[in-house]
Amino acid sequence: MAKGEGHILAQNKKARHDYHIVETVEAGIVLTGTEIKSVRAARIQLKDGFAQIKNGEAWLVNVHIAPFEQGNIWNADPERTRKLLLKKREITHLANELKGSGMTLVPLKVYLKDGFAKVLIGLAKGKHEYDKRETIKRRDQERDIKKQMKHYNAR
């Protein structure tokens, strides 16, 4: 866990499988009252989400936050785009990295830090199919080695 990182509410495990993560940035999220209650209850899905930069602002798109059960009329649209809180130089740096390079911004995890919801955004480049197979093969080999070492040390 990174320094100062709190309770993890949601993780995007598929992102690390589908992308090479080049750089990570922590950002705050602008949420309504009922949305933060749903996030605290870990009712958030990052699977299809991504971030984009429009007009000098960062936005989180396609992240599903389930409606709060007791929220009734105050519930917002679960799929709405949400503003990300980043410093201006961070936004310009990310915008420069994204220009024409085949890179994208993916949310990696959502967690609470000092009572505020934060999202860890990864600057990522898509993996090819053979890269994914290679990652799976390497993981299986490491698992087999650990299993054999455990069996060997048990004697």
Curated annotation (Swiss-Prot):
The keyword Cytoplasm applies. Its main location: cytoplasm. It comes from the Bacteria. Residues 135-147 have a biased composition (Basic and acidic residues). GO terms for molecular function: RNA binding. This is SsrA-binding protein. Pfam families: SmpB. Belongs to the SmpB family. Residues 135-155 are annotated as: Disordered. Keywords: Cytoplasm, RNA-binding. InterPro entries: SmpB, SsrA-bd_prot, SsrA-bd_prot_CS. One of its GO terms (biological process) is trans-translation. PROSITE patterns: SSRP (PS01317). Required for rescue of stalled ribosomes mediated by trans-translation. Binds to transfer-messenger RNA (tmRNA), required for stable association of tmRNA with ribosomes. tmRNA and SmpB together mimic tRNA shape, replacing the anticodon stem-loop with SmpB. tmRNA is encoded by the ssrA gene; the 2 termini fold to resemble tRNA(Ala) and it encodes a 'tag peptide', a short internal open reading frame. During trans-translation Ala-aminoacylated tmRNA acts like a tRNA, entering the A-site of stalled ribosomes, displacing the stalled mRNA. One of its GO terms (cellular component) is cytosol. It is found in: Cytoplasm.
